[in-house]
Design a protein with these regions (language model features):
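N-terminal helix-turn-helix DNA-binding core of bacterial DNA-binding proteins
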Residues: 4-38
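Alpha-helical DNA-recognition elements
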Residues: 49, 104
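C-terminal regulatory/oligomerization modules of transcriptional regulators
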Residues: 106-151
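The short coil/loop that forms the "turn" connecting the two helices of the helix-turn-helix
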Residues: 37-38, 61, 93
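Basic, amphipathic "hinge/linker" alpha-helix immediately C-terminal to the N-terminal HTH DNA-binding motif
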Residues: 62-80
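Glycine-centered, phosphate/nucleic-acid-interacting loop/turn motifs that mediate DNA/RNA or nucleotide
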Residues: 54
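Key DNA-contact positions within bacterial/archaeal DNA-binding proteins
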Residues: 41, 96
């Protein structure tokens, strides 16, 4: 597996753990497998890799939690996904295609490029009153409520 593919895969798993953690009390490998449509053995291999990289912890019950580094990476990836998806939808791209394209683009953008895209996106008229802006705030608020974590 190439470095890019490994990086993209890791970011997708971390993003999935964050999404699940925002909607349920505990995250297990089976939850990730169901969300992504992957086999449980594939997810288990990925979780082992993420644990070795210091991105997640797995307790005795098999519950998965993001470490500080994992949370930062997951938040960054998810924020890119939300901003890019909604920017593309505002440009007239269908929601499905926008989500698929955002998932591919989010892994290759430099931090500088993403910040400029986000700045432009946040200047759109009425954005602060929109559901998509509220989703960004939810990400920020969730990350700040995780013990030991700060945005």
């Amino acid at each position: 597996m190439s470095t890019y593919a490994t990086h993209e895969s890791s970011e997708n798993y971390l993003e999935s753990i964050l999404v699940l953690a925002m909607s349920q009390q505990v995250v297990r490998s089976i939850d990730i497998a169901n969300l992504l449509g992957f086999s449980k053995p594939s997810v288990s291999v990925a979780m082992k890799h993420l644990r070795e990289e210091g991105m997640i912890t797995v307790d005795g019950n098999g519950y998965i939690a993001l470490t500080e580094a994992g949370m930062a990476a997951a938040k960054a990836t998810y924020e890119k996904h939300v901003v890019l998806t909604n920017m593309l939808v505002r440009l007239g791209v269908s929601a499905y295609t926008a989500g698929q394209d955002a998932c591919r683009i989010e892994h290759v953008l430099s931090p500088e490029t993403f910040e400029k895209i986000k700045e432009h996106y946040l200047k759109q008229p009425g954005i602060e009153d929109s559901a998509e802006y509220q989703k960004l705030q939810t990400i920020r608020n969730f990350v700040q409520t995780v013990p030991g974590r700060q945005d």
